[in-house]
Amino acid sequence: MNVGELCKRAPVTAKPFDDLVAVAQLMRKEHVGYIVVVEPSVHESAFNPIGVVTDRDIVIGVVAKGVDPKSLQVSDVMSREPALAFEEESVGAALRKMRKIGVRRLPVVGKLEELIGVISLDDIIDKLVGELEDAAGSIRSEQMIERALRK
């Protein structure tokens, strides 16, 4: 399975010069803890990811330091040049990338590095658990059939 099949499309995004408080409110409204920061692409109606902001970035990097978030823009706290997962990349490769750099989410991009979606560790785990449950169900069914035939 590739990343493009599993990722969540149309992720919540922000621009670098957006007000940080407004973006925090957007996170709350949309029930997300991760926003991809984008800039317009040279390709029509596409956007390229240039950074990410997490709820943790805001809490640890701003609030806990006593900095007034009203005085900041997204670009002041975003992580720049995020690692990316490509749409055609395998889910296993994306998982290894996440583990190597210590993140739980990656922006997903197309061939021209235009933003397509976001893949998270939770998405991958949910998919794997579902597949394991399906496999376990098949094994149980086979065992039940075998027992019935032996009677």
Predicted segment positions?
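Tandem CBS (Bateman) regulatory domains
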Residues: 1-10, 50-86, 90-99, 120-151
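Generic preference for well-ordered secondary structure
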Residues: 4-7, 16-19, 42, 47, ...
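A glycine-centered beta-loop-beta connector
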Residues: 27-30, 35-57, 98, 106-122
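The conserved cystathionine-beta-synthase
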Residues: 13-32, 37-41, 85-102, 109, ...
